[in-house]
Amino acid sequence: MKLKIKKGATVQVITGSDKGKKGTVIAVDANAMKIQVQGVKVQTHYDKKDGLLKKEGFIDYSNVKLVEAASKEKKTSKKATKSKSA
């Protein structure tokens, strides 16, 4: 299934322990229908070398709503920009 939420979009959590938090989408797993949001579902992991590490966990796609879509920048060719300025 194709997801409407893409990497870089701003979303708000609507259910769960992090309800009401807003963040930017870091990663999307379309097969499992899960997304990773910055600052939401922060998990702590202990590593022998680095000590305690904090990392965002994946949350279900249905638990968030889209606030602002990821912006797409228009690609312009060099020829088009030269002809406009000339």
From Swiss-Prot:
SUPFAM superfamilies, A to Z: Translation proteins SH3-like domain
InterPro entries: KOW, Rib_uL2_dom2, Ribosomal_uL24, Ribosomal_uL24_KOW, Translation_prot_SH3-like_sf
Keywords: Ribonucleoprotein, Ribosomal protein, RNA-binding, rRNA-binding
Annotated Gene3D superfamilies: 2.30.30.30
Pfam family, one: KOW
GO aspect biological process, one term: translation
Source organism superkingdom: Bacteria
GO MF entry, a single one: rRNA binding
Family per record: Belongs to the universal ribosomal protein uL24 family.
Subunit structure: Part of the 50S ribosomal subunit.
Protein's name in the database: Large ribosomal subunit protein uL24
Source species of the chain: Bdellovibrio bacteriovorus (strain ATCC 15356 / DSM 50701 / NCIMB 9529 / HD100)
